Amino acid sequence: MRLAILSDIHGNPIALDAVLADIQSQGAVDAYWVLGDFAALGYDPVTPLEKVTALSHARFTRGNTDRYMVTGDLPVQPEKAREDPALLLQVIEAARSFSWTKGYLSAAGWLDWLANLPLEVRLTLPDGTRLLGVHASPGRDDGPGIQYQHSDGKLEKRLAGCEADLVIVGHTHVPLDRQIGRIRAINLGSISNPVTSGLQATYVLLDADEHGYNIQLRRVDYDREAVIKAIEQSHHPTPSFLIGFMRGERVLSSDPGFFQAGRRAQNQKEK
């Protein structure tokens, strides 16, 4: 069986189209998992939702920004700006950006769909490996997520009690492959809003049979100049923030081999 697992599309159908084309170039997949952050912080909130919900055998989870669309929460809470006035501009820009996105989603009738997204998806692979897909970390669609700079001890606490052997997440936009005790943790990166130096879209292909599974991180180029032009034409209220991602102004990591692409993993459960 083969799964294509992606996350963090962030309202960028140009990047999504490039990834879907790459998936097709690799042969047929049995199912798609999309792990949240579909619409916000992008120039086109609606088209990616139309595209992913048209995929065959697709399952979805919510991301933190999907929840914000429903609840009205913001990534930076207004009360924080009272404690730190330097955050005031971030609060104002976040409110404008999320309000703009929510308006489009509401007009197109997508808010109820977002409101009903599950927190996680699960599957038992043919070899018995228990797979968990969630946006940020087990039990959460927000927070620090699964990050490469975190110690094994910190990640072990974050993964505790998840009842899975393999956990795949997004949220941080930085790919990662770590063995934490008996749990393998994979961060697939992001489709859009890159924060690693390659500025590519990244996603995971998972091949599994009764002997084990293989995970491949795919890196996909897309036309970032076309994205910039689309942002400029979209009347998004904070275009410079979005364009900054496309121009590499928000790079957090050079991504120096944190992901062991193509590693073959055998079932590690006790016999």
What are these model-derived regions, one by one?
Residues H10-A15, A40-Y43, T65-V70, L166-Q179, ...:
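Active-site environment of divalent metal-dependent phosphoester hydrolases
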Residues Q26, G103-Q179:
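His/acidic metal-ligating clusters that form di-metal
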Residues M1-L55:
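N-terminal active-site segment of His-dependent metallophosphoesterases
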